[in-house]
A protein has these predicted regions:
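Basic, glycine-rich polyanion-binding accessory segments appended to enzymes
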Residues: 185-188, 192-255
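Residue-level signal for well-ordered, solvent-exposed loop/turn and beta-edge residues enriched
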Residues: 70-72, 160, 198, 253
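Short, catalytically relevant binding-site loops at active-site mouths
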Residues: 137, 161, 168-171, 178-180, ...
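Short beta-strand/strand-turn micro-motif
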Residues: 152-170, 183-190, 241
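Conserved beta-loop-beta connector loops within the AMP-binding
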Residues: 119-122, 158-164, 196-199
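Core alpha/beta nucleotide-donor-binding catalytic domains of modification enzymes
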Residues: 1-122, 130-131, 135-151, 250
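Short acidic, glycine-rich loop/turn motifs
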Residues: 77, 156-158, 235-237
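Active-site-adjacent loop/helix segments that line or gate small-molecule/cofactor pockets in enzymes
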Residues: 137, 164-178, 212, 231-242
Length: 255
């Protein structure tokens, strides 16, 4: 039996992906897909059919902690850890998910797949977004929205115009390559102003920051803190962990 969740996928994942890029942000559609489709519609359907849980091939682990009364999400224990794309799950969702590949390495999984005669055993790894073709996300956005991206100005941090960009959806914070303009020395995207249709560029060192604002928070393993707590954090996949201070703010975000 095939469960058709294509409309949910389009509405929750693809539409949101396009909206975020055109607002000057860089989304992670896998996070949204896991929360709303794989462990949203699919998990709901499984439970309605009387099943206890859904098992997937994510490299992660979930376990119940009787001392805190909470389900905790753990890293997959391998170089292919995928726990970061599962952070948006709720306690109710985690209670009904199993991750049988936890603690295994990718080559172990491939070997088991070969033994079972599965045709995907030697399929290459993919880090690409599943619904974006090889032409890249910019071309996809133009096709999906039916409108070409609007050119605008590259500016420095004082507002001085440095050149022209080909649409804010083509750029992301920290980007240096592929700007399409030669500036004589390295320039990095430090901010995207969607309201003004401007891409703000800075020189070496200006692409770093000592703090950030985080939203869409999920305190999976702990009760939401009332004050600052010491944590380790990483700002992107495969970046090293770093000590940090998390300060909850009144609007539900955190610094």
């Amino acid at each position: 039996q095939v469960l058709d969740l294509s409309e949910d996928f389009r509405r929750h994942v693809v539409d949101a992906f396009a909206q975020e890029y055109l607002a000057g942000r860089t989304p992670n559609p896998c996070v949204v897909c896991n929360r709303t489709v794989k462990f949203g519609g699919m998990l709901d359907y499984a439970l309605e059919q009387g099943m206890d849980c859904v098992a997937t091939g994510h490299y992660a682990h979930a376990a119940y902690d009787p001392e805190t009364g909470r389900w905790k999400l753990y890293r997959g224990g391998s170089a292919k850890d995928q726990s970061y794309v599962l952070y948006g799950l709720s306690q109710q969702q985690l209670a009904h998910i199993r991750f049988p590949l936890w603690g295994m390495e990718k080559e172990q999984v491939r070997a088991l797949a070969r033994e079972a005669g599965l045709p995907v055993a030697d399929k290459g790894d993919s880090m690409e977004i599943c619904f974006v073709p090889k032409g890249g996300h910019a071309a996809f956005l133009e096709w999906y929205t039916g409108a070409p991206m609007k050119p605008g100005d590259f500016v420095d941090e004082t507002g001085k115009v440095l050149g022209r960009h080909q649409g804010i959806g083509r750029y992301t914070i920290g980007q240096r390559k592929g700007l399409g303009v030669a500036f004589g020395r390295p320039r990095y995207v430090v901010r995207i102003d969607a309201a003004r249709n401007e891409v703000v560029l800075g020189e070496e060192g200006r692409q770093t920051a000592s703090s950030l604002l985080a939203d869409d928070l999920r305190y999976l393993s702990i009760v939401p803190p009332c004050g600052p707590i010491r944590i380790t954090a990483r700002i992107r996949y495969q970046a090293p962990d770093a000590p940090a201070l998390l300060t909850p703010l009144a609007d539900g975000t955190a610094r």
